[in-house]
């Protein structure tokens, strides 16, 4: 990637003019058009204003028949001069009044944000050009609005494509209460009608005549039993930068925001630049803060950086950080297939060799051993053979893509099938383990028997009481994994690195906190939930919130 920042020779791949990977970015306000751009694509003509000739408003003299004695010529000349002078004075006074009036009169909508929407055009394969509202030369036509990908700004600087902006329209509590007793189908119909009214009114206020929502999904794409995309349909392919995961397959993928690049950069002058990340680029294994510093050095300290979500929202980096510290860096890394694992030594998959009768009427403690270690060093052991045959699947746990949590094979296979398949092939386990499961009652009993805390000890993950005092003294925070619980206090069957609890400012489960001799709120006590953001599209006829609002999380 080539930011070409001052004092920085590294490159950031941008889809903007002047960068190594260019999208032929066109500033619509600063370039003349001839109807076709350099790529041969038709330009949106936004400069079609014409001069209107001024017309003099002088009236012709009124002719009246002379029925009386002829007036004295001097008197007539005097009266004519007086009338002409008086008319000119009145006209001058009116013109001055109008000049003063229009010189001071603001245009309708002058108090709206000048960057409340961005229009994006596709100028080639993996190439895009964006223009903010204030940089448009001429108001686009209805067809031109609908041919673009329209991005709407919310109250904290995130930008939403049409279907997601429509989805975020709030239903007033009073209306929701009225609809509560209706059949679900009728509820949905009434809610849609209300949102559509708000949508159309908001577009009229913004001056946008193209109002298509583009919410229709591709009817040729079948969903799984949970109404989610099947693994083979969860990705779109770019020409140069690999695959990108998406959450929905829209009929109009461009207008719905699915094809947009990874990063949107908005300068203080409201110029728009786009950028992709890819494996081995100039920011490989570098943190987002370094990228941010280079971009702001190049474009200005008030430059905004938006990172695309899998749903298609361009999230402001400061907004992401206000919710989860380090989340902007994690997303920045994911674009290039990197992760931000706190402990890169965790085994990719383990099998629990504990929970066996101890010969004294009890059970041995949990002891999760690296599957790779077993297969490499004990290839002929009964445990190794059983694992190869797909047995012991309910004792196996696998590492998630982020490298910071373990989960069951079936859970990972469902949530991240691509990573699951790669991991199982890597360690030599059959993917059929991901299609096994117990009845819920059995599954939750097993979760409840799990150790509250396990720690990394070479190729093992062991319970705290099994560690010697010396090892406990050497224990690092990044070696500790916590058995997670949901909001109801139930075990989820997953383990998460305690450093993630700290990063996310999460409350520790009480049993884990007791073992670690830490208060449950050690990490969560300082957490302050950010103010909810004003949606990108809202009903101007009512107050969004009755309570006073403080500053937004990023003052945008």
UniProtKB/Swiss-Prot annotation:
One Gene Ontology term, aspect cellular component: host cell nucleus
Entry-linked InterPro entries: VirE2
Compositional bias segments (type: Basic and acidic residues): 52-73, 539-548
GO molecular function: DNA binding; identical protein binding
Keyword annotations of the record: Crown gall tumor, DNA-binding, Host nucleus, Plasmid, Secreted, Virulence
Keyword Membrane: no
Alphabetical GO biological process terms: DNA-mediated transformation
Chain segments annotated as coiled-coil in the UniProt record: none
UniProt biased composition (Polar residues): 10-25, 36-51
Region Disordered: start-end pairs: 1-95, 527-556
Protein's cellular compartments: Secreted; Host nucleus
Highest taxon in the source lineage: Bacteria
The UniProt record lists the keyword ATP-binding: no
Induction (free text): Targeted to degradation by the host proteasome by VBF and Agrobacterium virF in SCF(VBF) and SCF(COI1) E3 ubiquitin ligase complexes after mediating T-DNA translocation to the nucleus.
Subunit structure: Interacts with host VIP2 that promotes T-DNA integration into the host genome. Forms a complex made of virE2 and host proteins VIP1 and VBF. Forms heterodimers with the chaperone protein virE1 that prevent virE2 anarchic homopolymerization. Interacts with A.thaliana VIP1 that mediates its translocation to the host nucleus. Forms a complex made of VirE2, host VIP1 and VIP2 and single-stranded DNA (ssDNA).
NCBIfam families: PRK13868.1
Protein task: Involved in DNA transformation; mediates the nuclear uptake of single-stranded DNA copies of the transferred DNA (T-DNA) element. Binds single-stranded but not double-stranded DNA regardless of nucleotide sequence composition.
The protein's name in its UniProt record: Single-strand DNA-binding protein
Name of the encoding gene: virE2
């Amino acid at each position: 990637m080539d930011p070409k920042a001052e004092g920085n020779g590294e490159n950031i791949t941008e889809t903007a003019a002047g960068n190594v990977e260019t999208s032929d970015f066109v500033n619509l306000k600063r370039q003349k058009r001839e109807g076709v751009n350099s790529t041969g694509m038709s330009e949106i003509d936004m400069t079609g204003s014409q001069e209107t000739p001024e017309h003099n408003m002088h009236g012709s003299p009124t002719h009246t028949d002379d029925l009386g004695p002829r007036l004295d010529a001097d008197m007539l000349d005097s009266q004519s001069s007086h009338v002409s002078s008086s008319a000119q004075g009145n006209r001058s006074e009116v013109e001055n009044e109008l000049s003063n009036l229009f010189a001071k009169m603001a245009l309708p909508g002058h108090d709206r944000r000048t960057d409340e929407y961005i229009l994006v055009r596709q100028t080639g394969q993996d190439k895009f050009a964006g223009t903010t509202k204030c940089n448009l030369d001429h108001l686009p036509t209805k067809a031109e609005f609908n041919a673009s990908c329209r991005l709407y700004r919310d109250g904290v600087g995130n930008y939403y494509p049409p279907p997601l902006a429509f989805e975020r329209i709030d239903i007033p509590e009073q209306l929701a209460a009225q609809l509560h007793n209706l059949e679900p189908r009728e509820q949905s119909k009434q809610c849609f009608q209300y949102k559509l009214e708000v949508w159309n009114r908001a577009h009229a206020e913004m001056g946008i005549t193209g109002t298509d929502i583009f919410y229709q999904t591709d009817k040729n794409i079948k969903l799984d039993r949970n109404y989610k995309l099947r693994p083979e349909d969860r990705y779109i392919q770019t020409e140069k930068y690999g695959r990108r995961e998406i959450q929905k397959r829209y009929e109009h993928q461009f207008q719905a925001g699915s094809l947009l690049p990874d990063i949107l950069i908005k300068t203080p002058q409201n110029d728009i630049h786009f950028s992709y990340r890819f494996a081995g680029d100039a920011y490989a294994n570098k943190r987002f803060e370094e990228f941010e510093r280079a971009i702001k050095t190049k474009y200005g300290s008030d430059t905004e950086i938006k990172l695309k979500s899998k749903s298609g929202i361009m999230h402001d980096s400061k907004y992401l950080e206000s919710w989860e510290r380090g989340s902007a860096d994690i997303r920045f890394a994911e674009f290039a297939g990197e992760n931000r694992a706190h402990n890169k030594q965790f085994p990719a998959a383990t099998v629990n060799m504990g929970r066996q009768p101890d010969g004294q009427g009890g059970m041995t403690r949990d002891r999760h051993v690296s599957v790779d270690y077993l297969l490499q060093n004990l290839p002929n052991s009964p445990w190794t053979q059983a694992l190869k045959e797909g047995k012991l699947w309910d004792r196996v746990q696998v590492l998630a893509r982020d490298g910071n949590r373990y989960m069951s094979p079936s859970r990972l296979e469902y949530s991240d099938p691509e990573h699951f398949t790669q991991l199982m092939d890597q360690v030599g386990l059959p993917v059929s383990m991901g299609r096994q499961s117990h009845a819920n009652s059995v599954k939750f009993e097993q979760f409840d028997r799990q150790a509250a805390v396990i720690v990394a000890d070479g190729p093992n993950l062991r319970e705290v009481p099994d560690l010697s005092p010396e090892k406990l003294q050497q224990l690092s925070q990044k070696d500790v994994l916590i058995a997670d619980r949901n909001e109801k206090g139930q075990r989820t069957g997953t383990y998460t690195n305690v450093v993630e609890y700290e990063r996310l400012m999460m409350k520790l489960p009480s049993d884990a906190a007791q073992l670690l001799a830490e208060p449950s709120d050690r990490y969560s006590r300082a957490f302050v939930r950010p103010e909810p953001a004003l949606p990108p599209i809202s009903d101007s006829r009512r107050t969004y919130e009755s309570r006073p609002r403080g500053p937004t999380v990023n003052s945008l």
